[in-house]
Amino acid sequence: MLDFPAHYSSTPSTQCLPPMRHPSLVSLSHDHHHGLALALRCRKQALGQLKPMGAAGLRERAKEFADFYRLNLIAHFRAEEEILFPLMRAAVPGSAALLDELLGQHEQLRQAVPQLDAGSGLAKLIFDLGDLLERHIRKEEREIFPLFEAHIDAPQAEMIGVELKKILGEGGGVSVNDKGLD
């Protein structure tokens, strides 16, 4: 079990806050936050609940998703696939099926991004991508990260944090909105 810094508290407050993450996972969680917001925009856009509506809005959202993939998900997936998942597979008994499912979702997302350039079926594709991205992120946040925090000791966690930062950069990924690409 990890020892968290003294200032780190998972004690519930009066507000409903997301779970605190071990510092080594914060950059991945930061990407997840932006990914969840994008997933919601994708689903709303596909359902005609965001302006601009119609084909123009769908093209805008497709570009946003492709930009997010390029700026965030490529490095994010690499960090998970090269650093986090191999450690989890070795250290957490019974995690193989869950990790294989997540790797399969990475591949689904990779294969779907080039389809965003196609004109037909864009609403369904954007909705499906938003849905898949949300389910994927929630599974990592609710299942993988708690397993990491329960099974990985402090020295391993620190080492993982350093390795993740090498791939993701000091601040983790950036929001597409942060780059003015929305």
Predicted feature residues:
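Small-residue-biased structural context
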Residues: 2-182
